[in-house]
Amino acid sequence: MANLSSLPSPIYCVSFNQDNSGFAISWKDSFKIFDSTTGRLCYERAAGAFVIVEMLYSSDLLAIVGAGEQASLSPRRLCLFKTTTGLPLRELNFLTSILAVRMNKKRLVVVLLEKTFVYDLNTLVMLDTIDTVPNPKGLSAFSPSLEGCYLAVPASTTKGSVLVYNVMDLQSHSEIDAHRSPLAAIALSSNGMYIATGSEQGTLIRVHLVSEATKSYSFRRGTYPSTIYSLSFGPSTQLPDILIATSSSGSIHAFSLSLAINQRSKRSTSFLGSVLPDSVSDALDPAHHHVLQNAVSSGIRSYAVVRKIDKLEGTSSPSHFTSLRATVSVITYNGYFQEYTLSINNKNESLWTLEREFNLFSITTG
C-alpha cells in the first residue's frame, strides 16, 4: 500500500493486489477497483473517504479503513468488506489509527504506530502482537506466498534497520542493517526470497537475500537525494528479473537484478572479486540501471509495479534481440494510470515505450 503524500493530492490511497492483476484507488468520496490488464473499472463504491483499500487477489474481499472525515469511517476501524454483497463481513477496532493492512489467503496483518497485529484471516483470531519502533507512515512490506510469507517493518528510527518476521511461523526471522539513515521504502519479492530497501537519503537501493541477511547488493538510484515513493519486484518464482522504483525526481528506475547479480557472482570467483572489499564489490554495474526520465512531474507521488515479464531466450541472436520485456504499470497521485513496456536486449540496451495512459477519474462502469 502506498500511503498519503505530504503534497496536496486528490488520491488518498493506491494499492495493487498480491499478483498485480488489479488495483484500487480512493479519494474524498469513493473508491474504485480496476483490472490492471484491461484498465476496466470493476467496482466502485461512493461511501466516503478511505485511507486503505486492500485487495485479496481478485476475490470479492476487501480490507478498508476510513479517513475519519465521517463519524462512521473511523481510521481506527478495519472493515472486511464483500463487493458482491456491498456489505461488511467483519470489523476490527483498535485504540489508535490503522496505518497499513496486508493479507494473503491465510493471514491478516494490521500495522499501527507502535504495534503490529497478526490474525488468522478465516477466523480473525489474533495470533501474535509485534511491538515495533514508532512507524508513523505505516512503512511495511509483505510477501503473500504461503511458503515464504514474511513481513518487514522498520527496526530503528535513527538508521535503516528492518525487522523481518515470519508470518506463518509467528516468529522473528532476522534484523537487517541496510542503511545509515532511516528507511523510506521496503519491498519483498512475492516468494519472500529477496528484500529491497531505500533510505530517506534516496541515493542507494539495497537488495538482501532474506535467508542470508548479511549478503547484499547495491544499486545507485541517483547522485542527489530524492524521496523514494515505491519499490516493487517483478514476478518470479526465484530471483526476480526486475526491481522497479519511483521517486520525487519524477523518474522511473528499473534495475536488472538477474543479470547484475549473476554477473556479480561470476566476478566474485575471479581474482579481482576476491581482493575487492565488500563495500566496493557489492556496488553493481550501473549499466544494469534503466531509467525513464520525467515520466511523472517532479514532486508528484507515484506507485509502480512490474505486472508481467516476458523472457526470450537466444544466445546466437543479433545485438538488437530483445531478451527481456517488462510490463510496468504506474499510478500517479494526481489521478493517472500509465503502462510502459521496458525492452532490454542482449547487449543490455533498453527502450521504454508508453503503451497507454488514462485519467482514473474519467473511467466509469458500463
From Swiss-Prot:
Distribution of this protein across tissues and organs: Expressed in roots, stems, flowers and leaves.
Instruction: Report whether Repeat shows up as a keyword of the record.
Output: yes
The cross-references to InterPro entries, in alphabetical order and at most eight, read:
PROPPIN, WD40/YVTN_repeat-like_dom_sf, WD40_repeat_dom_sf, WD40_rpt
Note the superkingdom of the native organism. Answer: Eukaryota
- What membrane topology does this protein have? Peripheral membrane protein
Entry text on domains: The first protein part may form a beta-propeller domain involved in specific binding to phosphatidylinositol 3,5-bisphosphate (PIP2), leading to the association of the protein to the membrane.
Q: Which SMART domains match?
A: WD40
Q: What does the function comment of this entry state?
A: The PI(3,5)P2 regulatory complex regulates both the synthesis and turnover of phosphatidylinositol 3,5-bisphosphate (PtdIns(3,5)P2). Required for autophagy.
How is the subunit organization of this protein annotated in UniProt?
Component of the PI(3,5)P2 regulatory complex at least composed of ATG18, SAC/FIG4, FAB1 and VAC14.
Instruction: List the protein's name.
Output: Autophagy-related protein 18b
Q: Where in the cell is it found?
A: Preautophagosomal structure membrane; Vacuole membrane
One GO BP annotation here?
autophagy
Write out the similarity annotation: Belongs to the WD repeat PROPPIN family.
Pfam entry (one): PROPPIN
A GO cellular component term found in this entry reads: phagophore assembly site membrane
What are the ranges of the WD repeats?
6-44, 178-218, 223-265
